UniProtKB/Swiss-Prot annotation:
Protein species of origin: Pelagibacter ubique (strain HTCC1062)
Keywords assigned: Cytoplasm, Endonuclease, Hydrolase, Magnesium, Metal-binding, mRNA processing, Nuclease, RNA-binding, rRNA processing, rRNA-binding, tRNA processing
Domain RNase III: 5-127
EC number(s) reported in the record: 3.1.26.3
Name by which UniProt lists this protein: Ribonuclease 3
Quaternary context: Homodimer.
Compartment annotation: Cytoplasm
Classification of source organism: Bacteria, Pseudomonadati, Pseudomonadota, Alphaproteobacteria, Candidatus Pelagibacterales
Annotated binding of Mg(2+), by residue: E41, D113, E116
PANTHER family (alphabetical): RIBONUCLEASE 3, RIBONUCLEASE III
């Protein structure tokens, strides 16, 4: 059994005027093939992007576009959405098909997508200003902690590999899935003496950065 959605409203200090759109934002297509959260997720993804982009411009008015773009990608990707969704325990409230009524573990992508759907529902019910406050409240510590060292992971890994092994890192595209408007890339990277490190991203470039970051973490923890 799922936890009552009203508890989620109380936890997040929300009060939806339209309860139907709130429940819809928590409904996966496996539970209801018609009234599910796919389209609201599409909207929520755009609203999240708008708010984060606006905040980054306010914080870094003189920063180069390329750096802003990478900061942006690190704040709106699936990994970050999942991290925030887990923090508010969103997975407890998602409606998914469970024919045997057993305790199941919901896929990470479904949880991350549901957070975007919830954002879309808040926007439709409360408007942009309220949604902006909601997003910035959840993302504030992540925005201030967005560090350039992680953004430049691919460059750092390349420099390390050339210095130590005299060859470039090897990147391999594992998969490209998801709908056209919301692709999900999986990329693996390895150095001459390492295993492959795999990560995902909303673009191939983003996935490569995330994989490079994992590889660097492994190198420097030794």
């Amino acid at each position: 059994m799922k936890t009552n959605p009203i508890k989620l409203e109380k936890k997040l200090k929300l009060k939806f005027s339209d309860q139907k759109i709130f429940i819809k934002s928590l409904t996966h297509k496996s539970f209801d093939s018609i009234n599910n959260n796919e389209k609201i997720e599409f909207l929520g993804d755009r609203v999240l992007g708008l708010i984060i982009a606006k905040k980054l411009l306010e914080l870094y008015p003189d920063e180069k576009e390329g750096v802003l773009d990478k900061k942006f990608a690190s704040l709106v990707n699936k990994k970050k959405c999942l991290e925030i969704a887990k923090k508010i325990e969103l997975e407890k409230y998602i409606l998914v098909l469970n024919p045997k009524n057993k305790k199941i573990e919901i896929e990470d992508k479904i949880v991350a997508d549901c957070l975007e759907a919830l954002i879309g529902a808040i926007y439709l019910d409360k408007g942009l200003n309220f949604t902006e406050r909601f997003i910035l409240n959840l993302w504030s510590e992540h925005i201030t902690a967005s560090v350039i060292t992680q953004i430049d992971a691919k460059t750092k890994l390349q420099e390390y590999s050339l210095k130590i092994f005299k060859v470039l890192p090897i990147y391999k595209l594992i998969s490209n899935t998801g709908p056209r408007h919301k692709p999900l890339f999986k990329v693996a990277v390895k150095l001459k003496n390492t295993k492959f490190f795999t990560a995902e991203g909303t673009s191939k470039k983003d996935a490569e950065q995330n994989a490079a970051s994992l590889c660097l973490q492994d190198i420097f923890k030794k």
